[in-house]
Regions:
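Catalytic core of membrane glycerolipid acyltransferases/transacylases, capturing the structured
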Residues: 80-110, 117, 132, 136-190
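Membrane-proximal helical "anchor" segments flanking the first transmembrane region
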Residues: 1-133
């Protein structure tokens, strides 16, 4: 991509992805196979907590969100791999970027909606019309994991804006963010 300088070599990037990508596939496989046992354990934990400490069911919801996250990561990684394999031609970089944006616009709501449903979260968006037609600067204060999804769900998707992100370099350990982030010309910072 034009104008980008990477602080890592191609070998370092491939090495990192050889470590991080399999963890998502193995994680999804393990959680899926053990899901019945994990669900019973989560339900027992939640019932005991509800009866003794009057706490809401949290373990069950976290298990469900964990599985949804892993499934979403695996689907994204597979989609990135397929688009990389089948996107050829003179405008390959541009088409890979567009496909990554489309993948992101399906991934973010696929995590955001279940989070909102399971944790009964409600959001009110004021001034959303201010994002059009762009250019626009969006500042999101990172206080929780959900905050990572908000720009895509609230601004980029509804207004079809291809946002660029400044992302903590440590988030390259999430292969979906790593691969998609590179294709969307985001900047990973220290």
């Amino acid at each position: 991509m034009e104008g980008r300088v990477s602080e890592e070599t191609r070998g370092e990037k491939i090495g990192r992805r050889l470590k991080t990508v399999p963890t998502r596939f193995i994680g999804l496989l393990v959680v899926t196979v053990l899901f019945p046992v994990l669900l019973v354990a989560a339900l027992v934990t939640d019932v005991v907590r509800a009866l003794t400490a009057h706490r809401p069911f949290m373990a069950t919801r976290l298990l469900l969100i964990g599985w949804i996250y892993l499934a979403g990561e695996v689907v994204c990684i597979a989609a990135f791999a397929l688009t990389w394999l089948f996107t050829i031609g003179p405008r390959r970089a541009e088409r890979l970027e567009r496909s990554a944006w489309n993948i992101q616009q399906r991934w973010a709501p696929s995590l955001f909606r279940p989070l909102c449903t399971l944790f009964r979260l409600r959001f009110t968006i004021e001034g959303a019309d201010q994002a059009e037609p762009g250019p626009v600067l969006v500042f999101i204060r990172h206080a929780s994991i959900i905050d990572n999804l908000l720009p895509s769900v609230v601004v980029a998707g509804p207004h079809e804006l291809n946002l660029r992100y400044l992302i903590k370099r440590e988030l390259r350990n999430d292969p979906g963010l790593d691969i998609g982030g590179d294709r969307l010309r985001n900047y990973f910072v220290r």
